[in-house]
Curated annotation (Swiss-Prot):
Cofactor: Zn(2+)
Presence of the UniProt keyword Zinc in the record: yes
Enzyme class: hydrolase
Signal peptide: 1-31
GO cellular component, one term: extracellular region
Reaction catalysed by this enzyme: Release of N-terminal Arg and Lys from oligopeptides when P1' is not Pro. Also acts on arylamides of Arg and Lys; Release of an N-terminal amino acid, preferentially leucine, but not glutamic or aspartic acids
Biophysicochemical property: pH dependence: Optimum pH is 8-9.
Gene: ywaD
Alphabetized Pfam families for the sequence: PA, Peptidase_M28
Taxonomic lineage: Bacteria, Bacillati, Bacillota, Bacilli, Bacillales
GO terms assigned for molecular function: aminopeptidase activity; metal ion binding; metalloexopeptidase activity
Name the UniProt record assigns to this protein: Aminopeptidase YwaD
Amino acid sequence: MKKLLTVMTMAVLTAGTLLLPAQSVTPAAHAVQISNSERELPFKAKHAYSTISQLSEAIGPRIAGTAAEKKSALLIASSMRKLKLDVKVQRFNIPDRLEGTLSSAGRDILLQAASGSAPTEEQGLTAPLYNAGLGYQKDFTADAKGKIALISRGDLTYYEKAKNAEAAGAKAVIIYNNKESLVPMTPNLSGNKVGIPVVGIKKEDGEALTQQKEATLKLKAFTNQTSQNIIGIKKPKNIKHPDIVYVTAHYDSVPFSPGANDNGSGTSVMLEMARVLKSVPSDKEIRFIAFGAEELGLLGSSHYVDHLSEKELKRSEVNFNLDMVGTSWEKASELYVNTLDGQSNYVWESSRTAAEKIGFDSLSLTQGGSSDHVPFHEAGIDSANFIWGDPETEEVEPWYHTPEDSIEHISKERLQQAGDLVTAAVYEAVKKEKKPKTIKKQMKAKASDIFEDIK
C-alpha cells in the first residue's frame, strides 16, 4: 500500500501573504513560466489523458512479463522515438510466479497466490468448500478430503495452516484476511513449499465464501519470463560527460486492474514532459525511463540502477519519479514529494522553488518508499516520488489495485497540476545557466553589474 507520512508542509509567499497548503485542488491558471523571458512550458493534460486511455482501455491490465506489458512497452518506445529521443530497451528476467482466478456463484474474486504453493491443473479445480476456521489440526475432519479449505487469517502462520490442510487431504487452500483491506492479502509461506495451491483473498470475500458450497480455482505457474525498461535519452549539445537527471515512472499494473492511475498516469505524464522538455536548452542529460515489473517488487528500477556504470553513477544527480498522479478522488488533495528518509533533498528543493514560481500551494514533503525512487536513493542519488494523497488518512484512493482503477477515475485537472509542477521542477534542475565563457567576459560582466548599482 502506498501510504504517506507527512514530515513537512510547504508554505508559499506570494505578494507578502502567507498561503497555507490547500486541502482541495483547483485547476492551474496558466502554463508554467520557466524564465525571466516568460518562455512557456506548455504541458497539456489532454495528451497525457489520451495516453492513459491507450494504456488502460485499449491494452488494459499490464501484468509484468505478459504480452500486454510488452505491447505497452512498444507504445512507449514508439512515443519516445517520435520525440526524437535516443531510445534504448533494457530487458531483464523476472522471478517465476503464480497467477490465477477464483470464482464462486458466478462471481469473480480477486486473489494473491502464495509463493511456494503449487499450481492447479490446466483446467483448474472445482471442488466443494470446507470451512476450516483458523486452520488448526483439530479444525480438520475426514470431511475435508478432496475439498478446498477456507481458512481465516490469525493465530497460526500461513505455512502451518497450509500444511494442516494438505495433511487433511484438502485439494487447495483459500486464506481470507481478518481485517478490512483494499486488496487481497498475500499468504507468506516463509520460503517453504506445499504441494497444493494456496491463495489469499480479502476479508469480505472470505466471509461471503463461507455461505457458498463450492468454488473454482485456476492457478498457473509463469516461468522464464522477461520484462523491459524503456529508456529515452535527451543529450545536451557540446558536453561530453554531463550530469544526468532521471524522470521515471512504471508502466506495469497488477492483475485485474486497468492501471489507469497506477500507473498509467505517471507514465503518461512522463511522456508529455518529454515532449515539453525535448527542445529546452540544457547542460544536463535527461533520461526518461518507463520501468517494467514495479508491481513485483521494483524489479525494473532495481535492475536499471544496479547496471549503471561507476561513471554513470558519479554523473547521476537526481531522480523525479511519478506514481499515481491523476486520481479524481476528492480527498487526495495534496501532492506529496515522497522521499525514502523523509528528508529534504534536491527533488524537494527544486519542487518547492517551482511551486513558488507557478503559485502552487498544495505541496508537502513526505516519507515513504514503495516506488521506483527507492533504488536511486539506495545508490546515493537524490530521489523522490510524486503522488496525490489524503492528508488526513494517508490513503491514495479507494480504487488502488482494483478493477475500478479505470479512466473514469482520472482527473485532467490533477494531471495538469502534477505535470506543471514536476515539469517546472525538472526544468529547475536541468536549465542551462548563462555564464561568461572567459575571465575577460566575466570581469566585464562584473563591471557592468557595478555600473548598474551606482547609476
